[in-house]
Structure formats: structure tokens, C-alpha cells
């Protein structure tokens, strides 16, 4: 819903709310509850329900009584315990948001009853901002700003974090009224409470970074110019007075200052930065100091709203390469469709380069790579300025790259965009290479030597880390124009000559990374809906003696150990808990840490423990156990002793205590709450719990604890939680995934066997040895991965998987003792060109089976195609092994289908997705089989059931089909001649066609003739000589009996 107010009016509304009575921006928004917007189709939001429930508790206690009585009632209720304290705090908080007229009074009450320094309220504000802001009613948004202003005025500890979350919601490239209102409202708070702002270094840096970026968007109208001037004044004052705090931003501060350099105030600042750096701070030595400092991820992430960040992370972790178009289209419609949104592309590219660093498993999978998203962003730039800024954002970490300080992951996207664009989008590659060459002398001439060295170091590191095996194919490519190639040779002669002899890219190279999944020449759209494919000329390259370049080898990037820092959380902990956390931090050996961890758990379980500290404690533990979450979980050699030793880590003490408790115990709930808080901050905790329950003797038979854990998390759902944890495990440790698989399938059959989600996760990453291990588990009865009621659906789902994944799924299915008839209907879904994996697996399994009528029906239901040999292959095999049984089944099917569909029926059946068995199909397959058996001694078509069925079909089908299948029906003619002699006129009619006469006088082979005569003798002994004279339909009926 758009705001219907101008900038000044909105600001006035915000200031009105500050008095406790402001109506807010767009108060009375239609639809939804009092807090969130919704439609009649949306389910009621759980958070909103809880807040409204708490509000009704407060209202019921304070309605109709004096202010003093209300205060007494609230205080008495709060004293009952932590849950009651939380209810009152959240109730008053909700009243502040939904009742502007009562806001001042409710805030005063909140300040009086809060026992945790407003921690509950701060956490809830953060949750609303991160998860629900886009759905918040406008009144609530305005009141939220008012409440934050009051918290800041009161100097509440942690309010700076809420301000930073608020700033994150201000979208770049968006000048809609709501966004401008939010930018101005937060700026007003920061300006009014300047002394408070100056107490927090991180808030200073974050505010400067945010508003420096927003200044670029705010131009044009008088209202925007006024806001822009306020932003300029704010940033300049902080930069001049607190430059060293701003220095923590790193090199991206220079990039943002470049974008605003022509504004007079920043022009003066630039002069000081370049010519008089000491004027800003005695510790500031000059611009090179800034440029050589890498920008922290938190700054790059703060310029994307939570929704943008979620969508971008989803694309880079869940969407398969080739299936990204609809997600990109949605993102473009939502965020990149206006002229003002051009500036947002830089934020997105910096975020992708600096924050999105996928794991090796993701890098080596078919998940949409970072370079493809960046390529798409570059191709959608419509402004020259935006395109130049986007290219600078992409190469920014190259300019002063230092292998010791910077990450390969920051520079990898640029080289891969150029590499992969060469075939489908050579213009993109050319413009990026040109930019790379020209930025060296033009970025800042006095530092040209440093920039040259930075770019050279980047290219050198790229080759060393095997991101590309060598750069000559890129720099000296005939698709580039001569001038550009000449400039590249001049600037980078070291990288322009091919190595001799050719460098072999060995697959076992641990740091090799060769993403040569080029797109075919036919495909011109690798940044939208392209399928990943190798280039058409790859075979030619191989034939010329060059080593085939492998699709990808993940980078083994050296993990830079960041120092553990729990300082921000210590002040929020009780003194005794704080001491224990510090002991845990200082503990040098595992045993000492375990003792301290047990003391922490014991303190958490004490009756007077403040449960509001769980969140802070979880943040500390998450920080302290970073190395544990990064390290190997499963021991190299799996024995009982090594498993028991592996679960002796401090973190696992929480799990051990949980296993020793009764589930209805309040201590049990408290530990689950602690784990839930930990899970929010470190999702890996989920699969660590699964491992502990699987590996520890103390946890034997306690796997159901995981279900309690899942329900205690914010997800609140076992299936979702389990799948997310197994996905996290798959991305981190494939060995552990395989180790957990048997127990996960055994303990949670309803969650694992009903769909192919977990199976796909497993087969996507296992190798052949791990597959064989799982097959053994199945055959020994330790593992069940399929059950009869869902196996068919799972195998149908698997048809979209990669080839090796499908083969794995079939191998695992065949290890189970499930009758093949259960899955035979899958044949109706299989197309010979699209599903060769499933067809070959099914064919090999069918040859081991005795044919049933249902099997034969499904096999014959396949459409006839000259290149599809599936039906003929299996029918021929059954002819050799089970000829009599097959003949009976075919006879029965021919008789049942002995009526060609009418036109109306065929139209109806053709609209069905699944193939319907028709008489013509059966005859076509039989004719193909007849031709295949023509030169063999097999006498399948001389069997009585087949000949009888063909007789009856011939008697009732039309002339067109008699002609089409004349050779097939001729077999029945011979059987008819030898069994009964029909009237002359009938005989003449039967022999009237030349093909019939030829076949009548010259039988195909001796075996068929002898088979035919023996069949006749058999028929003569039965008292049924008059059947042949009846009408076809009655004959069919009696013969069927």
C-alpha cells in the first residue's frame, strides 16, 4: 500500500507519534489483523497471534481500574515468573504499536515492569524488522519508529543494534514514499540523539556507510533535495569528527565517497583525505591505508534488505543452473524495474563477491553459480553510469588485492564471468577486459603502480588456485578485437602465452578449479534460462592434443581463523555466568572446557536462572565453538572407541544432559530453549545433535529427542527441520551424511520415505564406494529407503535428476525386496530419448522376472517408435524364457482390446497424459517382434493361443488394418487352413491379396509350419469345430473363456 503523504507530512506524522498520539503513515490500512497486513487466504500469523494474546492479558488486567491499581496488578503478575514477565512486556509492546493514543503511558509502564533491560522488547523489534516488516501495518511501522526513538532517548543497552536493523530495511535504489519516510525517520533519530550515537563505533560506521550510499538515490524533487542535504550534513560531521571509527569500513568507503565526490562538502573532504590526511585523524596516513583494508561482510550485507538477502541466498544455494529465469524475473520485477534501481546493482554485486562464499559442495554441484547472477545483472544495466559502477564493484577487490589479507572468493566471480561469457556474450567479456586494462592508469594515477600490482596479484592468484588453468585462451581469444588483444598483451604479457607443454589439470589437485561448463553455441542466454552444457567444440579441442578441461574442481580455501570475540555479549550476562563464559574462552584443553560447560548447564537449570539470558548465552557459545562447527565431526576411522571420543566435546554436554532428563521436566524444556536459540544462530547444531544421538552410548534409543528439539525450534516442524539439517550436513560433510542415513531412515520413516527429498540429497553427493556401502546396509536389513506405498512416486520424481543420481536411486531400489510390479506403471512416464537411465535399469530388472499380464500390458502400452527398442527387447527375451506364459497373456490382451477405438474415444484418450493400450499398439509391437524373430528358430508365433487371438482380431478388424498387418495375420490364415476348411468363397477372400497368397504357399520357416500343424492336431481333438462359423464377437467371448 503506497503512502499518500509527502515527505514533510510523513515526518510530521512520525513526530506526532513521538508524543504518543500520532496516527502513523497510512493508519487504518485495510486487510489483516491489527499488526500485519494479510488477505482472507492467509493463515493467521503465529507471532501476531501471540502478541495479540499477550496484549489481551494486559488489557484485561488494566481495563476499568485506576492507574495505580493497574501498575500494582502488572507488577504482581510479572513477579510470578519469567513467562509472566514476558507476557506483560510483549503485551505492552503490542499496545505501543497498535494504540498510538496509549503509547506514552504503555511505554512508561513497560519501563517500570521490565526486569531485563528491555531485552525481550529489543529481540521482538529485531524479529519484526527482519521477518515481518514488509507485512506490518503502516500505523505499526510509525509506532515502531517512535518506540525506537524512546528506547534511544532512555539509553537502553542494545538499542544501537535495533537502529542498525532499521537501517538495513532502507532499500537502495528505491525512492517510493514509504522508503523515503523510513530513511528520514531513522536519520532524525540518529541526528537528534547524536551524543548517544557517538558512544558506539560500529553504529557510527554503519550509519555513515548506509547514508553515504543513500545520498546517491536522493535527487530530483525539492523534498528529496532537503533530505539529501540532511544526509550530507550527517555524514560529513561523523566523517570529520570520528574518521578512525569510519576507517573500519575499509576500501568500500572510498568507493562510496567517489560516488558523491561532486557534492561541495565531499569535495572539500576529498581534498583533506588526499592532501592533508592528518587533519582527519593523526592515525590516518592516507588513502592507501583505506584501500588496502578489506571491507567487512557486515557492511556489504547491510545495504540489502532482509528480503533481498533471503532471495539472493536462495538463488545461490537452492536454484539449479538453467532453472533460474523465473527467479531472476521475479527479482527484477520486485527490485530492479525502475530507473532509480540502477544503483542497486552495485550493492548486489558487492554482496555476491564479498558475502556469498558457497561451500565446496555447492561450488561443485549444479547450483546456480555466482558468475551467472553477476552476468545477468551486468546485462540488465540500461545506464552507462550504472554499468561503469557495476564493473567497478565487480573488480574493486582486484585493485589492491593481497593474497595474505584478501580472499580468492572475492576475485573469482569476475574472471569466471569473463571466461563463461566468451561464447554466448563476447561483448560482456570484451567490455570487462577493456575495463580491467583501463582502470589501472585511471583509477587514481598517483597509485597506478599499486593498482597494477593488485590486478597482477589477482591474476596470479587465480592461476595458482586453478580457478582457470591458464589465461591465454581468454586474453588472446580471436573473438576479441585486435586493439583489445594488443592492449592485453601489453599490460599482461606474462598471461598471454600458452604454456608449453600444455599444463595438465589433474583431477586430484586439491585446489584446482576449472569451471569449463561452457554453454553451447546454440544458446545465447546463459544469464537467464540456459541449461548448463559443455561446448560443442570440446571434442575438437581434445582431438588436437589439448587436455580436456574438467568441469569444476572446488577451491580448498585456507580458512582464516577469526579471533573469538564474545565481548559484545558479556555485559548482558549475570556476573557468575559471565565468569564461566570467560573461563570457557580461556580453557586450553577439552576436559577443562567440558567441566566449565557442565557448570554453565547447571547454572541454566537453577530455579532462579533468568531465561531471558538464553539468547545471549547462545550467542556466546556459538562464537566460542566456531572451530568445532568448522571441524570434522566423524572420526577418520569409525570404531566404538573413536565415536565415543568424538562426542566428548564441550558443546555435546548440552545433548548429554538432555538425554538424562525426563521429557516432562521443566529443565528439559529450558535446555531445548537454549538449543533453539543456538539453532537460530548456528543451524549446524541440528545435524550435530543427530550425530550425537547416533554415536553416543548415553543416547542409545533416544533419537526421539530430535523430534522434541525440532518442535522447539522456530521451524516447529519435524519434516522441515530434518530436511534442512540433512541439507546442511550434505553441504558440510558427505561422510557424515552417509553415516547418519541408516538411523535417520529407521527412526523417521514417515518423514523420509514419503518423498524423494532426502534420497536426492544423498545421491547428489555420494560416490560409488558410498553407494555400495548403502546397498550393503539395505541388504543387511539396517536401512530401508523405499516402501511400497511411495516408491513409485519417488522413482517418478527421480526422472528429473542427474544421470549418476538416477543410477544410484535405481541401485538402491533394486537392493530392496519390493516386487517389480509395484513400480511397473512408471513405464507410462518413460520416454526413450529423455529417460534412458530408468529404461535401461528397468529393462535389466524385467528380464529377471516371469511376465505377469500387468507387466505385459504396461510393456505393450509404450508407443511404437523405430528407435525405441525397449518393448521388442523384453518381449524377445520373454519369448525365449517364458513363451507359453507370454502367449497366454498376449492372447488375453488382444481379446480384451479387440475393438479399435472410435474417433471420439481416441480424442478423449489422447488428452490423457498416460498412454492407453490400443489394439493397434499391440499389433505393431507383435509385428516388430515377428520381424526380430524371423531369422531364428523360435516358434513363438506358431503357438495356439497367439494364432487363435490373431484369427479373432482379423475377423473383426477393418480392411486398412488387415492390409497393414497382413504378414502378421497370414500366420493365422495358415493355422485356419490346417485346423478347419472354410467355404470356398471365404477361402478365396482370404487369399485374394498377393501377400496373403505368397505367405500361404511359402511359410516363413519350418519351425512355424511344424508348430502350426501340431496346433491343428491339438485343435482337432477338441469338440469345437463350429466356432469358426460364428460372428467374431461371440467367438472371442467363448475363446476367452
UniProtKB/Swiss-Prot annotation:
Presence of the UniProt keyword DNA damage in the record: yes
Primary location recorded for the protein, binned into one broad class: nucleus
GO CC field: cytoplasm; INTAC complex; integrator complex; nucleus; site of double-strand break; SOSS complex
Gene: Ints3
TM ranges: none
Matching InterPro entries: HEAT_Ints3_C, INTS3, INTS3_N
Keywords: Acetylation, Cytoplasm, DNA damage, DNA repair, Nucleus, Phosphoprotein
Coiled coil location: none
Composition bias, Acidic residues: 1006-1020
Lineage summary: Eukaryota, Metazoa, Chordata, Craniata, Vertebrata
PANTHER family: INTEGRATOR COMPLEX SUBUNIT 3 (PTHR13587:SF7)
The protein, known as: Integrator complex subunit 3
Modification sites for Phosphoserine: 500, 535, 993
Record text on subunit structure and interactions: Component of the Integrator complex, composed of core subunits INTS1, INTS2, INTS3, INTS4, INTS5, INTS6, INTS7, INTS8, INTS9/RC74, INTS10, INTS11/CPSF3L, INTS12, INTS13, INTS14 and INTS15. The core complex associates with protein phosphatase 2A subunits PPP2CA and PPP2R1A, to form the Integrator-PP2A (INTAC) complex. Component of the SOSS complex, composed of SOSS-B (SOSS-B1/NABP2 or SOSS-B2/NABP1), SOSS-A/INTS3 and SOSS-C/INIP. SOSS complexes containing SOSS-B1/NABP2 are more abundant than complexes containing SOSS-B2/NABP1.
Recorded superkingdom: Eukaryota
Region feature (Disordered): 975-1041
Function: Component of the integrator complex, a multiprotein complex that terminates RNA polymerase II (Pol II) transcription in the promoter-proximal region of genes. Component of the SOSS complex, a multiprotein complex that functions downstream of the MRN complex to promote DNA repair and G2/M checkpoint. The SOSS complex associates with single-stranded DNA at DNA lesions and influences diverse endpoints in the cellular DNA damage response including cell-cycle checkpoint activation, recombinational repair and maintenance of genomic stability. The SOSS complex is required for efficient homologous recombination-dependent repair of double-strand breaks (DSBs) and ATM-dependent signaling pathways.
Protein source organism: Mus musculus
BP-aspect Gene Ontology terms: DNA damage response; DNA repair; double-strand break repair via homologous recombination; mitotic G2/M transition checkpoint; response to ionizing radiation; RNA polymerase II transcription initiation surveillance; snRNA processing
Entry similarity comment: Belongs to the Integrator subunit 3 family.
Subcellular localization(s) per the UniProt record: Nucleus; Cytoplasm
Pfam family, one: HEAT_Ints3_C
Keyword field contains DNA repair: yes
Sites bearing N-acetylmethionine, chain numbering: 1
Amino acid at each position: 500500500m503506497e503512502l499518500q503523504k509527502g515527505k514533510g507530512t510523513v515526518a510530521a506524522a512520525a513526530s506526532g507519534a513521538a508524543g504518543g498520539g500520532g496516527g502513523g503513515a497510512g493508519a487504518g490500512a485495510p486487510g489483516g489483523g491489527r499488526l500485519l497486513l494479510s488477505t482472507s487466504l492467509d493463515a493467521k500469523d503465529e507471532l501476531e497471534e501471540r502478541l495479540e494474546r499477550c496484549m489481551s492479558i494486559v488489557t484485561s488486567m488494566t481495563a476499568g481500574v485506576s492507574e495505580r491499581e493497574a501498575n500494582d496488578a502488572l507488577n504482581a503478575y510479572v513477579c510470578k515468573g519469567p513467562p509472566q514477565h514476558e507476557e506483560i512486556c510483549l503485551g505492552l509492546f503490542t499496545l505501543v504499536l497498535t494504540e498510538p493514543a496509549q503509547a506514552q503511558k504503555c511505554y512508561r509502564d513497560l519501563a517500570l515492569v521490565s526486569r531485563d533491560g528491555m531485552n525481550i522488547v529489543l529481540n521482538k523489534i529485531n524479529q519484526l524488522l527482519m521477518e515481518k516488516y514488509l507485512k506490518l501495518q503502516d500505523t505499526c511501522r510509525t509506532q515502531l519508529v517512535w518506540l525506537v526513538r524512546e528506547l534511544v532517548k532512555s539509553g537502553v543497552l542494545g538499542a544501537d543494534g535495533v537502529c542498525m536493523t532499521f537501517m538495513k530495511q532502507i532499500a537502495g535504489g528505491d525512492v517510493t514514499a514509504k522508503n523515503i519516510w523510513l530513511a528520514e525517520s531513522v536519520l532524525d533519530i540518529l541526528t537528534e540523539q547524536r551524543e548517544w550515537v557517538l558512544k558506539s563505533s560500529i553504529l557510527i560506521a554503519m550509519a555513515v556507510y548506509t547514508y553515504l550510499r543513500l545520498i546517491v538515490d536522493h535527487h530530483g524533487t525539492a523534498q528529496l533535495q532537503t533530505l539529501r542535504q540532511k544526509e550530507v550534513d550527517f555524514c560529513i560531521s561523523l566523517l570529520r569528527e570520528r574518521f578512525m571509527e569510519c576507517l573500519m569500513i575499509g576500501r568500500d568507503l572510498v568507493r562510496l565517497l567517489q560516488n558523491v565526490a561532486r557534492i561541495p562538502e565531499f569535495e572539500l573532504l576529498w581534498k583533506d583525505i588526499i592532501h592533508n590526511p592528518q587533519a582527519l585523524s593523526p592515525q590516518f596516513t592516507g588513502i592507501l591505508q583505506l584501500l588496502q583494508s578489506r571491507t567487512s561482510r557486515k557492511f556489504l550485507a547491510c545495504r540489502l534488505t532482509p528480503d533481498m538477502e533471503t532471495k539472493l541466498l536462495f538463488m545461490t544455494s537452492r536454484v539449479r543452473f538453467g532453472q533460474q529465469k523465473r527467479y531472476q524475473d521475479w527479482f527484477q520485477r520486485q527490485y530492479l524495474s525502475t530507473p532509480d534501481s540502477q544503483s542497486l546493482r552495485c550493492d548486489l554485486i558487492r554482496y555476491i563477491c564479498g558475502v556469498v562464499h558457497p561451500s565446496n559442495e555447492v561450488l561443485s554441484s549444479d547450483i546456480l553459480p555466482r558468475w551467472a547472477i553477476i552476468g545477468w545483472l551486468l546485462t540488465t544495466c540500461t545506464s552507462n553510469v550504472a554499468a561503469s559502477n557495476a564493473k567497478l564493484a565487480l573488480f574493486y577487490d582486484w585493485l589492491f588485492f593481497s593474497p595474505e589479507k584478501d580472499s580468492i572468493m572475492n576475485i573469482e566471480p569476475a574472471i569466471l564471468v569473463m571466461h563463461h561469457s566468451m561464447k554466448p556474450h563476447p561483448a560482456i567479456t570484451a567490455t570487462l577486459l577493456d575495463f580491467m586494462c583501463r582502470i589501472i592508469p585511471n583509477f587514481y594515477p598517483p597509485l597506478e603502480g599499486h593498482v597494477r600490482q593488485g590486478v597482477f596479484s589477482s591474476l596470479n592468484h587465480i592461476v595458482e588456485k586453478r580457478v582457470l588453468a591458464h589465461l591465454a585462451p581468454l586474453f588472446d581469444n580471436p573473438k576479441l578485437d585486435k586493439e583489445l588483444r594488443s592492449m592485453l598483451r601489453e599490460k599482461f604479457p606474462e598471461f598471454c602465452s600458452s604454456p608449453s607443454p600444455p599444463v595438465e589439470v589433474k583431477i586430484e589437485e586439491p585446489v584446482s578449479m576449472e569451471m569449463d561448463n561452457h554453454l553451447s553455441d546454440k544458446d545465447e542466454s546463459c544469464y537467464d534460462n540456459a541449461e548448463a552444457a559443455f561446448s560443442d567444440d570440446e571434442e575438437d579441442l581434445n582431438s588436437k592434443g589439448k587436455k580436456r578441461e574438467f568441469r569444476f574442481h572446488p577451491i580448498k580455501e585456507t580458512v582464516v581463523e577469526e579471533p573469538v570475540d564474545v565481548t559484545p555479549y558479556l555485559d548482558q550476562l549475570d556476573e557468575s555466568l559471565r565468569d564461566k563464559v570467560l573461563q570457557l574462552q580461556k580453557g586450553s584443553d577439552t576436559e577443562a572446557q567440558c567441566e566449565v560447560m557442565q557448570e554453565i548447564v547447571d547454572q541454566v537449570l537453577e530455579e532462579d536462572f533468568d531465561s531471558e539470558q538464553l539468547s545471549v548465552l547462545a550467542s556466546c557459545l556459538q562464537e566460542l565453538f566456531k572451530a568445532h562447527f568448522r571441524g570434522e565431526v566423524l572420526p577418520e576411522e569409525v570404531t566404538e572407541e573413536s565415536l565415543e571420543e568424538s562426542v566428548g566435546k564441550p558443546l555435546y554436554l548440552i545433548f548429554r544432559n538432555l538425554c538424562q532428563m525426563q521429557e516432562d521436566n521443566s529443565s528439559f524444556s529450558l535446555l531445548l530453549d537454549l538449543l533453539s536459540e543456538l539453532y537460530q544462530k548456528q543451524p549446524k547444531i541440528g545435524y550435530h545433535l543427530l550425530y550425537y544421538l547416533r554415536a553416543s552410548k548415553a543416547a542409545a534409543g533416544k533419537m526421539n529427542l530430535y523430534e522434541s528439539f525440532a518442535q522447539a525450534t522456530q521451524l516447529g516442524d519435524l519434516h522441515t527441520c530434518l530436511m534442512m539439517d540433512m541439507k546442511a550436513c550434505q553441504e558440510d560433510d558427505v561422510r557424515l551424511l552417509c553415516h547418519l542415513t541408516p538411523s535417520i531412515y529407521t527412526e523417521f520413516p514417515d518423514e523420509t520415505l514419503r518423498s524423494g527429498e532426502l534420497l536426492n540429497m544423498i545421491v547428489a553427493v555420494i560416490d560409488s564406494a558410498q553407494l555400495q556401502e548403502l546397498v550393503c546396509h539395505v541388504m543387511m536389513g539396517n536401512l530401508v529407503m523405499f516402501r511400497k506405498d511411495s516408491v513409485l512416486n519417488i522413482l517418478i520424481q527421480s526422472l528429473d535428476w542427474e544421470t549418476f543420481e538416477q543410477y544410484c536411486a535405481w541401485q538402491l531400489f533394486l537392493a530392496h525386496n519390493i516386487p517389480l510390479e509395484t513400480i511397473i506403471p512408471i513405464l507410462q512416464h518413460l520416454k526413450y530419448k529423455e529417460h534412458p537411465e530408468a529404461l535401461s535399469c528397468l529393462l535389466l530388472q524385467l528380464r529377471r522376472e516371469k511376465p505377469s499380464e500387468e507387466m505385459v500390458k504396461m510393456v505393450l502400452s509404450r508407443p511404437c517408435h523405430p528407435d525405441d527398442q525397449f518393448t521388442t527387447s523384453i518381449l524377445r527375451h520373454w519369448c525365449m524364457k517364458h513363451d507359453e506364459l507370454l502367449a497366454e497373456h498376449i492372447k488375453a490382451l488382444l481379446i480384451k482390446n479387440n475393438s479399435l477405438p472410435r474417433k471420439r474415444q481416441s480424442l478423449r484418450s489422447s488428452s490423457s497424459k498416460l498412454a492407453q493400450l490400443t489394439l493397434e499398439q499391440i499389433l505393431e509391437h507383435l509385428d516388430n517382434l515377428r520381424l526380430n524373430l524371423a531369422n531364428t528358430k523360435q516358434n513363438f508365433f506358431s503357438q495356439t493361443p497367439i494364432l487363435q487371438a490373431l484369427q479373432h482380431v482379423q475377423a473383426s478388424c477393418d480392411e486398412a488394418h488387415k492390409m497393414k498387418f497382413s504378414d502378421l495375420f497370414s500366420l493365422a490364415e495358415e493355422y485356419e487352413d490346417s485346423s478347419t476348411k472354410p467355404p470356398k468363397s471365404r477361402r478365396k477372400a482370404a487369399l485374394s491379396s498377393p501377400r496373403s497368397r505368397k505367405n500361404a504357399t511359402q511359410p516363413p520357416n519350418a519351425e512355424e509350419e511344424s508348430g502350426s500343424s501340431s496346433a491343428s492336431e491339438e485343435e482337432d481333438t477338441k469338440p469345437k469345430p463350429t466356432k469358426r462359423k460364428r460372428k467374431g464377437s461371440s467367438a472371442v467371448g467363448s475363446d476367452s473363456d
